[in-house]
């Protein structure tokens, strides 16, 4: 398990960031088996020590591609569980999410699937499995209202997916969420955040690398990327540690 969020400053030089950003590699059931297997096989390659601290990939984001069907997604979840990494289950289909949690719940995954239309059912699943629930929405107002509704239902074990339709929107989301929590003391936005760079720069690994660096500073608790080999890890893990 990893501790996320808990930050008290907007800028690192004001004090420090207390809980470092965690990186996740994205897998999707929409991928072919060869691609999935190759990406999973590459995960252990990044594992080294820097200044007495282990540097390795901590998480896997397991995305549900509805067009591939539930069965393939559940098989992918099984493969991801076998890696021993912490999982983020990116699935907003309640029935598929329920089945995925049955497979993965022992490892305490994050269920990133709540939105304005399904949050009640997703909340029930997350509370039953005792896992963190991820909240997304069409815009910040919708996310805010959904988080408030979940809090009213008694769930504060949440994480906010700040990923928007564009880089500009995502950056604004991340900054506004942090500022609302710290400057305005609005605890409805006082949760860790997920930023998915694989959605912001589709199949552009160089842009994704730049965006991972950006959202390490601005204010991703979990940042998702398509791949994180040794060459990509070196320029990210050093600044994150510093």
Model-derived regions: residue spans:
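Catalytic alpha/beta core domains of metabolic enzymes, predominantly
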Residues: 117-242
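Active-site beta->alpha loop and helix N-cap motifs at the rims of alpha/beta catalytic domains
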Residues: 2-145
């Amino acid at each position: 398990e990893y501790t996320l969020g808990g930050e008290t400053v907007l800028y690192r030089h004001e004090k420090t960031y207390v809980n470092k950003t965690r990186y996740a590699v994205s897998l999707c059931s929409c991928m072919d088996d060869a691609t999935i297997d190759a990406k999973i096989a590459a995960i252990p390659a990044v594992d080294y020590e820097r200044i007495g601290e282990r540097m390795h990939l901590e998480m896997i984001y397991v995305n549900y591609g509805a067009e591939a069907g539930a069965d393939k997604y559940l098989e992918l979840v099984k493969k991801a569980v076998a890696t021993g990494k912490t999982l983020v289950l990116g699935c907003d289909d309640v029935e598929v999410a329920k089945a995925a949690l049955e497979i993965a719940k022992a490892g305490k995954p994050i269920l990133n699937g709540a939105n304005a239309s399904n949050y009640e059912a997703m909340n029930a699943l997350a509370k039953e499995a005792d896992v963190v629930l991820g909240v997304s929405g069409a815009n910040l107002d919708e996310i805010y209202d959904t988080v408030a509704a979940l809090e009213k239902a008694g769930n504060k074990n949440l994480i906010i997916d700040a990923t928007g339709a564009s880089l500009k929107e995502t950056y604004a989301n991340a900054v506004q969420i942090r500022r609302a929590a710290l400057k305005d003391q609005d605890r409805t936005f006082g949760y860790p955040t997920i930023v998915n760079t694989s959605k912001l720069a589709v199949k552009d690994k160089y842009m994704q690398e730049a965006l991972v660096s950006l959202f390490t500073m601005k204010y991703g608790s979990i940042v998702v990327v398509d791949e994180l080999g040794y060459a990509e890890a070196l320029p990210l893990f050093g600044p994150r540690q510093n």
